[in-house]
A protein has these predicted regions:
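Conserved C-terminal structural/oligomerization subdomain of aldehyde/semialdehyde dehydrogenase
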Residues: 2-3, 27, 50-66, 187-190, ...
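N-terminal Rossmann-like NAD(P)+-binding subdomain of aldehyde/semialdehyde dehydrogenases
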Residues: 2-178, 225-227, 239-244
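ALDH superfamily catalytic-core signature
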Residues: 16, 29, 227, 237-248, ...
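Conserved A3 ("GATE") glycine/threonine-rich loop of ANL adenylate-forming enzymes
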Residues: 131-141, 145, 256, 276-278, ...
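Active-site-adjacent "gating/activation" loops or surface patches in catalytic cores
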Residues: 161-204, 208, 215-217
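Conserved residues at the C-terminal ends of beta-strands
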Residues: 197, 255, 274
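PLP-dependent aminotransferase-like
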Residues: 205-257
Length: 331
């Protein structure tokens, strides 16, 4: 890296006239952002045109698409895991390569299998009735979700996971409220366009977030990758080709500026964030001095109608009563 930096410096010193000016660099960046925005805008319009078509697909049609996604994953899975290992400087043949398989192709395949099993087994909305439950000391109901299959028991030995219900929700209410996205007849559903701002730590997280929006919430998705995962774009596009081909999903790379632009797009009805609190705050409150001013006035800058946040949810709640008044969080 030092040698490369020295060579660059030497070249610049030898040909000062050819070095781009600050204005030229800015213009180049602006042109790049403008092109990226134009491409993203075109994709958002295609998603918007297809949103109701997706919302009205039946469970059987979604199962067929998920099976097609599984088939599409297989030819790229090995290169996907190998490329991720190389980027993280994991030696070829190292046991650590297994982590890239588990947090990449396997995670997506497993999610597809679980959604397929759920959609095929769902009778109305009664699937939750088959899951083990227990009552906590405080009276809340906990539903066991992992392990659920034989593969869970083999690969996740000793790991258990439960969903703890809100206080006051008994078993009857749980059965009635499960699979809400499928409660409305397919012909009566209305679609929405969701922006998923992909996390950067685990490659599979944005993929699973995307399936959440598509299959659980009936929303088509523009997935913007975290820049650290831009190199995985070809693999994600190949794996999700059955959904991308029908304009139910689009995947784009891009920096924070493109993400900020997409957050303000008129066609984006919902934003899904999995990441740092700083990302959340930049979306809701703005940046720099504007953030301090907006937070001081308890008035966010042009907030989206809905913001779904995971790890940054506590930051959202600290804003005060404002979010209950203007920014309902579903789920």
């Amino acid at each position: 890296m030092t040698a490369r930096a020295s060579a660059t410096t030497a070249t610049t010193a030898a040909k000062p006239a050819s070095a781009p000016s600050e204005a030229a660099q800015t213009d180049g960046q602006t042109d790049g952002h403008t092109k990226a925005q134009a491409e993203a805008d075109a994709l958002l319009h295609r998603l918007d045109a297809a949103k109701n078509s997706w919302a009205t697909t039946t469970a059987a049609e979604r199962v067929a698409l998920l099976r097609a996604v599984k088939v599409a994953i297989m030819p790229v899975a090995e290169d996907w895991a190998a490329t991720a290992s190389q980027k993280k400087q994991i030696p070829a043949g190292s046991p650590l390569e297994g982590e890239e398989w588990l947090s990449g192709p396997y995670a997506l395949l497993s999610a597809c299998n679980n959604f397929i099993a759920t959609l095929e087994a769902m009778d109305g909305r009664s699937l939750a009735a088959t899951l083990p439950r227990r009552r906590l000391r405080n009276g809340q109901t906990a539903v066991s979700v992992v392990p659920h299959t034989l593969w869970d028991r083999l690969l996740l030995s000793g790991i258990r996971a439960e969903v703890w219900m809100q206080p006051g929700l008994d078993s009857t209410a749980i059965d009635e409220r499960s699979a809400q996205a499928y409660a409305t007849p397919a012909s009566e559903r209305e679609g929405r366009v969701a922006l998923v701002l992909g996390a950067g730590n685990i490659a599979a997280i944005p993929l699973l977030d995307t399936l959440q929006k598509l299959l659980v919430e009936n929303q088509v998705v523009l997935l913007k990758l975290n820049p650290v995962n831009d190199y995985l774009l070809p693999f994600f596009e190949a794996a999700f080709k059955p959904l991308i081909d029908q304009d139910f999903l689009a995947v784009i790379p891009g920096d924070a500026a493109l993400g900020a632009w997409a957050c303000e797009h008129d066609l984006v009805a919902e934003i899904h964030v999995t990441g740092a609190g700083s990302t959340h705050d930049a979306i809701v409150w703005g940046t720099g001095a504007r953030r301090a001013t907006a937070q001081g006035r308890d008035a966010p800058e042009q907030p989206p109608d809905y913001l779904r946040a995971r790890r940054c949810l506590p930051h959202y709640r600290r804003a005060g009563a404002m979010e209950r008044r203007r920014h309902p969080i579903s789920g």
